[in-house]
Regions:
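Gly/Ser-rich "nucleophile elbow"/oxyanion-hole loop immediately N-terminal to the catalytic nucleophile
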Residues: 1-29
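A general structural signal for stabilizing positions within well-ordered secondary structure
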Residues: 17-20, 42-43, 66, 98
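Structured loop/turn residues at beta-strand edges in well-structured enzyme cores
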Residues: 21-24, 46, 70
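Gly/Ala-rich beta-loop-alpha elbow adjacent to hydrolase catalytic centers
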Residues: 29-34, 38
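Active-site-proximal loop/helix segments of hydrolase catalytic cores
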Residues: 34, 43, 117
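Conserved hydrolase catalytic core segment
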Residues: 40-49
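The feature captures the conserved acid-bearing segment of alpha/beta-hydrolase catalytic domains
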Residues: 49-115
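Catalytic histidine-centered segment of alpha/beta-hydrolase-like enzymes
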Residues: 113-126
Length: 128
């Protein structure tokens, strides 16, 4: 099978898998900047019923969302490195979690550190 046909078959299978799901009830997961992105979506999309942020980074969260309490359950699991860091980003996350209307579970792992990773080397030979 040619590469293009193989890629198309993978996307067709993924589309079938998504179509079989109830997209009116979404749960989201995000790490680091992705954690901020899922916080933003969870606050603005009524289909989202819960969210799990792993070392949530608050930079992508808009001012509009910061002003509005989150209404869905949010589980925050942080590294000790970030949970015990009292910088601006940690303060923003603490404020967001404190004013949330839905249940919030905020935990951190003792002696843990934030892990950074990127897919850029897989997307471009110039990135790796």
């Amino acid at each position: 099978m040619a590469q293009g046909h193989k890629a198309f078959a993978i996307f067709a299978h993924a589309a079938q898998a998504v179509a079989a799901r109830d997209l009116a009830k979404l749960g989201l997961f995000g790490h680091s900047t992705g954690g901020g992105a899922i916080f933003e979506v969870a606050a603005t999309d009524p289909r989202v019923k819960c969210a799990f942020g792993l070392d949530t980074w608050t930079e992508p969260i808009s001012q509009d969302v910061r002003a509005t309490p989150l209404k869905v359950p949010f589980f925050s699991l942080r590294s000790a490195q970030w949970a015990l860091n009292h910088d601006e980003k940690a303060r923003i996350l603490a404020e967001l979690l404190a004013k949330a209307k839905g249940p919030v579970y905020d935990q951190y792992l003792i002696d843990s550190k934030h892990a950074d990773f990127t897919l850029m080397p897989l997307l471009s030979p110039f990135a790796g």
